[in-house]
Amino acid sequence: MKTISLRFLMTLGLMTLFVVSPFAQKDTGKIRIIMFGAHPDDCDERSGGTAALFARMVYAVKFVSVTNGDAGHQSMKGKELAKRRYAETQESAKRLGISYDVLDNHDGLLMPTLEVRLEIIKKIREWNADVVLAPRPNDYHPDHRYTGVLVQDAAYMVAVPDIEPEVPALRKNPVFLYYEDHFQRPNPFRPDVVVDITPVYDKKIACLDAHVSQMYEWLPWIGGYYEEVPKGKEERIQWLTARTSRPINAQTMASLEKWYGKERASKVKEVECFEVCEYGAQPSDTEIKRLFPMLGQ
């Protein structure tokens, strides 16, 4: 394995002091979940509702942004933007009751290097994760794709003692899952696990609302709908709620009925979906219910 320089290790140590969320959670002995996103709002968008449900059960949940988001704005940039977006992650963490870390990799320039892979391995080990969520490695944004690749590359290595030996290897392999996306090639997303987030949908909207630079500025600007964004706080929440809501398609409904039963599934309004990754532990339905105890409740 390539030798890592002392300078790199010192830099990584200093960086970690800056990016670790102050909203750390105690180890309760319950399921531990870590969710990776490329940018400091991605986890919120893909799994904010599921995180809220886990947090409500006092499970240990951590979001990790693999980049610092320093390119995601039409007028701000660099350190100023990264600082603002970090503050937004901490507000989101406070609203959800979770931990939120941000790695100091540049937005838009992420590559699946050994150094970043080791960062991912360390995060998973340090959290002693039972469940790991990440994007699929087929996506329009290179940072999303490479975040998926990096987590895939870590899936086996988290249990190998000689890799990153200063952090003890896991004695179990976590279950790795992908967030939902709409991309069809090389293969479409498969909703193996569908979580009813209707009871906590307001929590998801609240955590998204914390990312003001993204929800009300950058994404509307780059998406061509900036003029639609309301000015008032309450109007913005209503607008964001409407924009975030998605219809439940037939494939998702079939999986929802599997986990909740037809009667309950028919009443569900909002969901988040996940696909089991072929890497990592391969869970049975019984194990999925243990890891996602909100299923069927």
Question: Which ranges hold each PLM region?
Answer:
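N-terminal secretory signal peptides that target proteins for export/translocation
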Residues: M1-S5
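Residues that line or immediately flank small-molecule/substrate-binding pockets and catalytic motifs
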Residues: F8, N68, R136, E180, ...
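Active-site rim/loop-helix segments in enzyme catalytic domains that contact anionic ligands
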Residues: F23-W127, V149, M157
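C-terminal accessory domains and tails appended to enzymatic cores
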Residues: G29, D162-P165, L170-K172, N187, ...
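Bacterial N-terminal signal peptides
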Residues: R7-V19
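Internal alpha/beta domain cores that form substrate/cofactor-binding pockets in large enzymes
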Residues: K62, S99-D181, F189-R190
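Flexible, active-site-proximal loop/turn residues at the rims of small-molecule/cofactor binding pockets
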Residues: G49, N138, H182, G280
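Short acidic, glycine/proline-rich loop/turn micro-motifs
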Residues: H73-M76, N187-P191
